[in-house]
């Protein structure tokens, strides 16, 4: 069989999408368009509410506004191309376009992960060490955490894309997914991917597990501290400040772990698609609702923003 390297000798890949059934393309287009618009509008409202209300200019809401921005970027990398493909017969993505999509998908997704860890640290300091909160979570420290999150994520993405660009591909160029993700693309390669899989798994463990463990450790510390609070009202107040964030963490990491922390031989296309939709589309769409429905400060900020818009 002749081996061809797609980086130089082909026009690109074909994205199979969520379903090959022609009758489902328009309904899926409508569903994902609505979800994308809800994601964009909801997260923009969160950002505007935070920046328009001085009382929300705190470390927690600084990270939340950046998380909302990253969620918009994250879904924009994937959903617009998916929407075009729903109404297109070719569903082609160029080789370079595939690598670019893969790069920004990983960069924004990993930044999301680090921002969730930063928010967990913020809650840890606020609940477990409130007297030192202003010192530990000063604006300069928060900015450094944000810059560190972005830098590590983009370096990780660059390394991964450079690794993928060295692979060769054979006759098949159909990606059984709705975007260019690592596992489906690796499955197409006719190169020896064992070393690539090992590097990807090791590097993924280092980059993704680090913020995840940081988040878990923070919440274990928070739980221990809250359980020592004598009054039930005090416990409820402490837990209520973390409930929204913890819900988002479970949704995000639950699906990420299911998709990425398995050998390539165990990868299931259909299950992988469903789990990927959860953290790439559903979670970013739900985040504004999760963070605002039970948050009095956010409700006040959104109400204030609404009065400004209509006044």
UniProtKB/Swiss-Prot annotation:
<feature type="topological domain" description="Cytoplasmic">
    <location>
        <begin position="122"/>
        <end position="140"/>
    </location>
</feature>
<comment type="similarity">
    <text>Belongs to the G-protein coupled receptor 1 family.</text>
</comment>
<dbReference type="Pfam" id="PF13853">
    <property type="entry name" value="7tm_4"/>
</dbReference>
<comment type="function">
    <text>Odorant receptor.</text>
</comment>
<feature type="topological domain" description="Extracellular">
    <location>
        <begin position="81"/>
        <end position="101"/>
    </location>
</feature>
<keyword id="KW-0675">Receptor</keyword>
<feature type="topological domain" description="Extracellular">
    <location>
        <begin position="261"/>
        <end position="273"/>
    </location>
</feature>
<keyword id="KW-0812">Transmembrane</keyword>
<keyword id="KW-0807">Transducer</keyword>
<keyword id="KW-0716">Sensory transduction</keyword>
<feature type="disulfide bond">
    <location>
        <begin position="98"/>
        <end position="190"/>
    </location>
</feature>
<dbReference type="GO" id="GO:0004984">
    <property type="term" value="F:olfactory receptor activity"/>
</dbReference>
<dbReference type="InterPro" id="IPR017452">
    <property type="entry name" value="GPCR_Rhodpsn_7TM"/>
</dbReference>
<feature type="transmembrane region" description="Helical; Name=7">
    <location>
        <begin position="274"/>
        <end position="293"/>
    </location>
</feature>
<keyword id="KW-0552">Olfaction</keyword>
<dbReference type="GO" id="GO:0004930">
    <property type="term" value="F:G protein-coupled receptor activity"/>
</dbReference>
<feature type="topological domain" description="Extracellular">
    <location>
        <begin position="1"/>
        <end position="26"/>
    </location>
</feature>
<feature type="glycosylation site" description="N-linked (GlcNAc...) asparagine">
    <location>
        <position position="5"/>
    </location>
</feature>
<keyword id="KW-1003">Cell membrane</keyword>
<dbReference type="GO" id="GO:0007165">
    <property type="term" value="P:signal transduction"/>
</dbReference>
<feature type="topological domain" description="Cytoplasmic">
    <location>
        <begin position="51"/>
        <end position="58"/>
    </location>
</feature>
<dbReference type="InterPro" id="IPR000725">
    <property type="entry name" value="Olfact_rcpt"/>
</dbReference>
<keyword id="KW-0297">G-protein coupled receptor</keyword>
<keyword id="KW-1015">Disulfide bond</keyword>
<feature type="topological domain" description="Cytoplasmic">
    <location>
        <begin position="221"/>
        <end position="237"/>
    </location>
</feature>
<feature type="topological domain" description="Cytoplasmic">
    <location>
        <begin position="294"/>
        <end position="311"/>
    </location>
</feature>
<keyword id="KW-0472">Membrane</keyword>
<feature type="transmembrane region" description="Helical; Name=1">
    <location>
        <begin position="27"/>
        <end position="50"/>
    </location>
</feature>
<feature type="transmembrane region" description="Helical; Name=6">
    <location>
        <begin position="238"/>
        <end position="260"/>
    </location>
</feature>
<dbReference type="GO" id="GO:0005886">
    <property type="term" value="C:plasma membrane"/>
</dbReference>
<dbReference type="InterPro" id="IPR000276">
    <property type="entry name" value="GPCR_Rhodpsn"/>
</dbReference>
<feature type="transmembrane region" description="Helical; Name=4">
    <location>
        <begin position="141"/>
        <end position="159"/>
    </location>
</feature>
<protein>
    <recommendedName>
        <fullName>Olfactory receptor 1L4</fullName>
    </recommendedName>
</protein>
<feature type="transmembrane region" description="Helical; Name=2">
    <location>
        <begin position="59"/>
        <end position="80"/>
    </location>
</feature>
<feature type="transmembrane region" description="Helical; Name=3">
    <location>
        <begin position="102"/>
        <end position="121"/>
    </location>
</feature>
<feature type="topological domain" description="Extracellular">
    <location>
        <begin position="160"/>
        <end position="197"/>
    </location>
</feature>
<feature type="transmembrane region" description="Helical; Name=5">
    <location>
        <begin position="198"/>
        <end position="220"/>
    </location>
</feature>
<keyword id="KW-1133">Transmembrane helix</keyword>
<keyword id="KW-0325">Glycoprotein</keyword>
